[in-house]
């Protein structure tokens, strides 16, 4: 919302809802001061959605397990939606929302921010130019980052796949979506392997307290020490997403909060975390394009290699730091390498590689100027397919099967498979 207020001629906030009052007030305070008194605040989504339609577009940014109900009610009230990913906690509900949006003629944009980044748009332009020739295969990697993984997918909201969604959906639906977008064709088959190997009690070589605040050794001696939230600014910034008032809190107040919160736990003794800390998937797309995707807690940043009949493309943080450039194209026979220029993030705002700014700046066009929902940048119709891919990868990981995407979707819709 803060970014949307950079476009006052396009956007106006009329209401906000959150069970934590200060968060709703923060949304209100993003608006120009002269408009704040007219903005209505509600205690929760139910209260807001019990009102007649208040605006053109509703933004739903609740936790993963509470997307479906408010999204469904908002669509039925006549709202177009900007919906945080994943679309819903289950694939069946995801497909139900897709079908409901089509039935009601409503526009639903999904926050797949990678589609809006200068980085991935530059890659897509290279592919569409034909410079690589026909695409044959790709390797894509997402390094979640060690502290990020421990914060979000062990201690945090997404540590348990039943309470949230499977890792490939909760985190990597961004990747499934961007690969679908880059390949520009449907995925037909997937297989996958992945395990929770490291963040479990068996990793410990000797007993220790389950809460880091009960440890007596020097802070930071163990790299996973939650007390680093107090002493290390690079760790503390993650608390801004889960602890209200952290910017004004004293070290003593943060320590007290850690004593009872999920984020004070030892990452090896959380007990309820079940997300794989490493995962690989093999994907086959229409026309025979194949690719691999790797998710790991033990690297940071995304990188990708795409191999065509004329040339190969290499891109990502690894190549920016260790090679000739963030994106390069190398011809197979001449060995000539071209560095692809990547635009700076618009407006100087680099959140999600500039994708946050891109999403907001395109929202008005997508909701009001695009001739049809399918011409939006992230329509639910396209995003739903990437969710099918992600849930199919999870099914393949659990069962060891090679999963046919169309058949998997049919079995989920029929109730034969519970996803």
Locate each region found by the language model.
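C-terminal helical cap and adjacent loop that interface with cofactors, partners, or active-site loops
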Residues: 17, 275-419
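Predominantly a Rossmann-like dinucleotide-binding segment in NAD(P)-dependent oxidoreductases
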Residues: 114-266, 400
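Rossmann-fold dehydrogenase core element
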Residues: 96-113, 133-140
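N-terminal Rossmann-like dinucleotide-binding module
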Residues: 1-36
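Beta-loop-alpha module in the N-terminal Rossmann-like domain of NAD(P)-dependent dehydrogenases
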Residues: 37-100
């Amino acid at each position: 919302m803060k970014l949307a207020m950079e476009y006052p001629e396009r956007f106006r906030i009329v209401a906000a809802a959150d069970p934590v009052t200060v968060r709703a007030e923060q949304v209100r305070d993003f608006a120009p001061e002269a408009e704040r008194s007219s903005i209505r605040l509600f205690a929760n989504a139910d209260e807001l959605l019990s009102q007649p339609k208040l605006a053109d577009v509703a933004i739903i940014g609740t936790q993963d397990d509470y997307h479906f109900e408010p999204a469904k009610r908002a669509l039925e009230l006549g709202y177009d939606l900007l919906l945080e990913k994943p679309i819903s906690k289950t694939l069946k509900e995801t497909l139900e929302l897709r079908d409901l949006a089509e039935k009601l003629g409503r526009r639903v944009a999904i926050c797949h921010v990678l589609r809006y980044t200068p980085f991935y748009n530059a890659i897509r332009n290279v592919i569409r130019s034909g410079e690589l020739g026909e695409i044959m295969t790709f390797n894509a990697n997402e390094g979640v980052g060690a502290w990020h993984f421990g914060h979000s997918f062990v201690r945090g909201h997404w540590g348990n796949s039943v309470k949230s969604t499977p890792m490939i959906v909760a985190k990597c639906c961004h990747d499934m979506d961007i690969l679908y977008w880059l390949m520009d064709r449907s995925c037909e088959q997937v297989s996958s392997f992945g395990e929770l190997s490291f963040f479990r009690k068996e990793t410990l070589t000797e007993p220790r307290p389950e809460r880091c605040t009960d440890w007596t050794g020097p802070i930071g001696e163990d790299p996973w020490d939650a007390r680093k939230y107090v002493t290390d600014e690079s760790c503390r910034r993650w608390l801004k997403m889960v602890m209200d008032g952290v910017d004004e809190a004293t070290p003593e107040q943060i320590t007290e909060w850690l004593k009872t919160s999920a984020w004070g736990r030892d990452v090896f003794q959380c007990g309820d975390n079940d997300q794989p800390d490493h995962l690989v998937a093999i994907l086959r797309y229409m026309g025979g394009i194949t690719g691999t995707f790797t998710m790991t807690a033990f690297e940071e940043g995304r990188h990708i290699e795409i191999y065509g009949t004329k040339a190969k493309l290499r891109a990502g943080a690894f190549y920016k730091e260790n090679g000739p450039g963030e994106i390069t194209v190398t011809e197979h026979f001449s060995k000539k390498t071209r560095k692809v220029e990547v635009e700076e993030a618009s407006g100087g705002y680099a959140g999600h590689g500039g994708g946050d700014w891109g999403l907001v700046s395109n929202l008005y066009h997508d909701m009001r100027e695009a001739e049809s929902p399918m011409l939006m940048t992230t329509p639910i119709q396209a995003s739903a397919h990437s969710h099918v891919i992600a849930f199919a990868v999870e099914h393949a990981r659990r069962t060891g099967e090679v999963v046919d995407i169309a058949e998997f979707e049919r079995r989920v819709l029929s109730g034969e498979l519970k996803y």
